């Protein structure tokens, strides 16, 4: 389709900074060689950052994801596709091999339906097999023009990733990382940690951009692409990209196109959402769902008690107990109060305030709600209940 998306090949570097990381890196190197991946030991990581060991993965690439998706949308509409925006799908009913896809004001029918929405909305097995995380990125202008001409990744926990990009003629270092589970750590602190790290390792002139995104981590490390488990034939899903949506999103198009057209695809069985119990990810499966159970119970206790709404600072949100009610309260800069139920409409966990993006985030399955309680990110389908004070 000739999509102009700033595509360019760049070498990728993965580097360690201590003995434990080096041992892990050596395992990755050996596994990569066995899999036929182009990898070799490197004398540089492309950055002004000290390292213990480093390996180069040749002919990696980067491209502009928005330009790419806009190009795909253009190609789709040119062959007759229709894109309907700002429409929440509430339900899918199937009758006589036809799927009735319902939204607030009507429905449409389809032979095949694909959930490409992180995890599908509602309560389903994929909510349990994926953990929601957020990642953070800074766009940094450097004093010394020491921008990397590669893709680099360290092995810290959480890790950092590095690349450069030109915006309106100005080159920027893109520094990402500080990942954490949605609704857990403080997003403001995540950005602060990245700023501190940047200042310690680069000659920073200014930080001109910052943003965050949500992704889902599958329990066994592989995405789920294929027929939706438990649903009627012809309902497909693609999720669990683990932050690699630019790769797995495109791969989804190939796999699902083959499945819909009755063709074989060598990756379909490996990535099937109905694959056998994820033995390799069983420990992670237990850990993540224990965390969900913990927040479901613990967050119902330890709520801040306030006597007056005046105690809440402007521009902030908190889950509090006020007049014997547990509430998610936000006070805007003019002092206007918005009070909501803090109970996520997905499975009943208690939401937490995200001060950076002004949202209520669920620590269990990653649902996010706007200040007025409307759904921003699934899997919840319904808004938080609103109270008048």
Give the residues covered by each predicted segment:
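C-terminal catalytic lobe of FAD-dependent flavoproteins
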Residues: 31, 156-157, 181-285, 340
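Helix-loop-beta segment of a Rossmann-like dinucleotide-binding subdomain
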Residues: 4-14, 42-74, 176-181, 239
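Phosphate-binding active sites in nucleotide-utilizing proteins
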Residues: 60, 73, 77-80, 86, ...
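Flavin-dependent oxidoreductases
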Residues: 91-164, 304, 310
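Helical element adjacent to the flavin cofactor pocket in flavoenzyme catalytic cores
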Residues: 23-26, 30-35, 54-112, 116
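Rieske [2Fe-2S] iron-sulfur-binding domain
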Residues: 138, 319-389
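Dinucleotide-binding Rossmann-like beta1-alpha1 core, especially the glycine-rich loop
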Residues: 1-43
